[in-house]
Amino acid sequence: MTKMKTIFAVIFLVLLIPVLLKAPESEAKVYRGKCKSNLTWSYDSKTKTMVIDCKGDMPDDEQFYDLDMGWRKYYFKTKKVIFKKGISSIGAGAFYNFQKLEEVVLPEGLRIIKYDAFDGCRKLQFINKPSTLEVIEKDVFWDVKIKSISLKNLKKLGSECFSGAKLQSVDIPAKCKIEDSVFWNCKKLKKVTFEKGVKRISYGMFRETGIKNIDIPRSVAQIGTYAFANCQSLKKAIINEGVKKISKDAFSNTALEEITIPSTVTQLGKNAFRWESTEKSSLKKVVIRSQNIKKWGTMVFGATRDDLVIYVPQSKKAEYEKILRSTNGLDFHAKIVGKNW
């Protein structure tokens, strides 16, 4: 038994030697590399900080795991990335799935963040926005922890670029081209404001967010398909005069209790305010002020409550009631009342 203990002790010491000889954290190294002719990088293993020094456009990592781009070797360690001045665009997929990344520092002069650049960086919560930034391409900040970011001066937001992010509020710029589902599934998003002049709310723009109320400005002409679909905390929506088209499923499966359709509306899309659950819709009151609705989708207010009241222009009561009763699945007890606006 004593001999066995001695053997185990020797084995233990042999295994312990590498640990005893290991360099302390205070002697952590700085690793360096180069990519293409215009980019150098360094990684400090003590601070877990990556510094990118690039002149012009950063190379794309379209494979997402291109180890020729040496900084990718530290995707599971890097906590902070600093870009030095001189870079004009961040490459596609450049920091895809950097699992520990928490902070990004961007310089003035940066114009474009290309697609998937920070996609999957689920711990990323701190980032500044340079005044020169114009374009954020698709999927850039998918599922990150960022709570707020300025969108001022942006010219384009790519599809799903903030999908699943932890944003709490956004201010939508008037002159920015906004592609599909930009804020889809941002469950923490409660507040949205629009700069004067916004003309369109795009497809799925706020789908499945935590918005509780929304005021759509008169400059908006079209509310896109699925724009506010499945926003189950949305209890109040003001659609101002100026809106012409409310698209398919624009407000389907929300918690709206009443809604007013302004006089400028000419198109109501299929399922625009439909509740598709087995439970009845929350809508109790609908006011239709428009006398010029030319296109009606089916089931605009489908699966309604039995106490729903829809107010329509008196001059259009017969026409609108026929459409609503025949194509919209109103409860038998729902009332349609003519009003002289």
Write out the residue ranges for each language-model feature.
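Short, surface-exposed terminal/edge motifs of secreted or surface/virion proteins that either
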Residues: 320-325
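Low-complexity, acidic Ser/Thr/Pro-rich repeat tracts that form intrinsically disordered stalk/linker regions
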Residues: 25-40
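Structural signature of tandem-repeat unit edges
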Residues: 49-57, 76-89, 99-112, 122-135, ...
